[in-house]
Every structure is written in structure tokens, then in C-alpha cells.
Amino acid sequence: MSVLETFDPAVAEVIRHETERQEYNLELIASENFVSPAVLEAQGSVLTNKYAEGYPGKRYYGGCHCVDVVENLAIDRAKELFGADHVNVQPHSGSQANMAVYFSVLKPGDTVLGMNLAHGGHLTHGSPVNFSGKLFNIVPYGVSKETQTIDYEETERLALEHKPKMIVVGASAYPRIIDFEAFRRIADKVGAVVMVDMAHIAGLVAAGLHPSPVPYAEFVTTTTHKTLRGPRGGMIMCREEWAKTLNSNIFPGIQGGPLMHVIAAKAVAFKEALTPEFKKYQEQIVKNAKALAEGLTKRGFKLTSGGTDNHLMLVDLSQTELTGKVAEEALDRAGITVNKNGIPFDTRSPFITSGIRIGTPAATSHGLKEAEMEQVAGFIADVLGNVTDEAKLAAVKTQVNALMKRFPMYADRLA
């Protein structure tokens, strides 16, 4: 038995059950992924014990010579990966990364253009329930009703009318390529700073499968998990002239001591992302997303904007008797994990929704490819066509478990 199993069997049991869920169920939440054993090892290391307020070479505590090395490794690898002038790897999350950028540029009451959450944006891009919507004057832009893609003309009109100090670019549920150059042109017409939140697409950007925002934005934020397949955390890139201001807004501005075990895990993930194998992995994510989108469309499902260019898709259930909530719960009972999600111009509440969001990063980490995505489309169709038939859902779950056992990820942790 492990030390944890001996001392705290209750927690050990929960961890084992979650490992089984990740190993045998089909994870299709677009923002989730599975880290490598090397990343897990770094994150579970004794670096968790070390306080290191400040930055490498300028700490407020002694004994930081080891953690200085690991933080510099993370910074240097991120710079190489994305071609950034300056990198801060200390944000605990994507939300805190965004907050630090806002505080570097804005004052309370300043005007910000951000993508409407209901159209695929993120809470921290100006939602009224988030700090960003409470502190700043938010003008939301969104997608065209006809194409369900970003309406750049309307965004420019809003910018010219409201003269924002910052334009926030990026999304949490947008399946198409984002034209960063177009946002830069719009920002330049009104003298706005551009912040790109590429949390969802960072892995694709690193692999050259989505245009990079770095040449077009003063600031680029990201999480280090999702497509980047690192530990849960945040990171900020910026132009050199903003470096000092940005650093001071992370520490001491909004955070105290950085999580050095997480920063070590970030460094490991960035090294993985610099390999040819990582590029092949990202290519497979996109291939799988397109194959799954095609399989769902073939079975009569409607996708917002008609498909996907990246790692995710939104299934529009508004013309069916299903809600996103019902669909999510039925799929969960069949061993398939997705999340209910609003669709553009949704009339249902965020707790019910008219859609589900599906992504392929985690399934691709398991090793699934296009042929399996065709099977997955069939599983989803079988479930959503029989949401009240528990026997059918159980049968699909058996098929899902059999499929996933062919593609082990953490099997050694269950031995």
C-alpha cells in the first residue's frame, strides 16, 4: 500500500476512482487534457515546499537557487516556443493572468471591448458577474447571426464608437480561426492596446496550426493546460516595454508566492511542446475534431458555424427537444464527458443551454484517431437519441469502456 492509502484511505479512494474515470471514460471537455507522467512527477515534487516571492535573482526569501533555475527554464522555453519578448510564468490561473494584464493597462471605469460570453467569449472578458465586468466599462462584440463567426465589421464599428483603451481577443467556445491581424488593425484605428487570451488554442499556436497572436498583441495570456497539455496554471507574454509593469502587477500586485512545483511542471510541458512529437499530436487533435464534426453532421446534428477549424465544436440542439443540460447528463451516464454550453443568440439560461461543447485534446492524448472519432460520433448519436433509455445508455458505456481500454493512459496507476 502507498503512504497515502495507509494514512488517508478516503482521499486515496477518491484519487483512484478519478483515475479510473479518466482512464476508462471518454473525456470530450474541450478545456481538459491529460498531462504526461513527467509533468505529474514535477508537480508532485518537493518544490511544493518552497516559498519564492519575487523573481529569479530578486527573491524575498533565501534558499531560492534551485527554484530560480527551474523558473528560468520555464521562461526560456516559453520564449522559444512562442517567440515572445518577455514571459511571466507565475500566474496561478488564466483568470489571474488576465487580471494582471488589465491592471497593467487599465484603471477602473476604462472602456474595454471583449467577446460576448454568450457568443463564445470567457467570463474574464467582461462578463457582468466577473471582476472584469464589475471594474471596467465593457462593450461586447460577437458573432454574425448569419455565419456565426466573428463579425469584424461590427467590432470595428463598436471600436470607433466607444474608443476602448483595450480590445480583448480570444474565446472559450469558438470553433474557427481568429484573425488577429484584423483586430490589430481595428485597435490601431482607436489607439487601443490588444490583449489576446489564447488559452484554448495555445497548443495549436505552438505547433503552427493556428496563426500566432504574438506579433499582433501587446499582451498574450494563456493557460498552460488545455491544448498545451501542461499543469493547470497561467502564463503571460508581453512586449519588452510592458515587462516591468506586468511583473509588478503579478507580484506584489495580485499574488504572493508563486507555486514552484507548478512552474516546474510548466517547464517540463514546454519542453514537451518543443518536440516534433508534440506537433504531430496537435495535428491529430485537429484531424480528430474535423472527423468528429463530420461524423456528427452526417448523423443529422447541427454545428455552430457549420464545423470547426480547431480542437472544439458546438453542437446546436435548439431545433431538437433536448437541452444542453439533458444532453450532458445523458452522455455522462454513458461514460462520455462533455459540457452544456450556450450557443450564439441562445434563449435558454446558462444552467440549461441549447448546446454542448465537445473537444478532442484529451481523447487524442489517449491515442484515439479518425477511425475512433467515427465510433465516438455514433456513441453520441445513440445516447442523444435515447436519453431516457437507461439500458441503451449502459450499453453505450460498455462500448466506451471497451474502446478506452485499447488506449491506456494511466493504467500503471491502477495496477
Curated annotation (Swiss-Prot):
GO terms for molecular function: glycine hydroxymethyltransferase activity; pyridoxal phosphate binding. (6S)-5,6,7,8-tetrahydrofolate binds at L117, G121, H122, L123, S349, P350, F351. It catalyses: (6R)-5,10-methylene-5,6,7,8-tetrahydrofolate + glycine + H2O = (6S)-5,6,7,8-tetrahydrofolate + L-serine. Its EC number is 2.1.2.1. The modification N6-(pyridoxal phosphate)lysine is found at K226. GO terms for cellular component: cytosol. Pathway: One-carbon metabolism; tetrahydrofolate interconversion; Amino-acid biosynthesis; glycine biosynthesis; glycine from L-serine: step 1/1. The record marks H225 as: Plays an important role in substrate specificity. One of its GO terms (biological process) is tetrahydrofolate interconversion. It is found in: Cytoplasm. Keywords: Amino-acid biosynthesis, Cytoplasm, One-carbon metabolism, Pyridoxal phosphate, Transferase. Homodimer. Belongs to the SHMT family. This is Serine hydroxymethyltransferase. It comes from Geobacter sp. (strain M21). The lineage of its organism: Bacteria, Pseudomonadati, Thermodesulfobacteriota, Desulfuromonadia, Geobacterales. The gene is glyA.
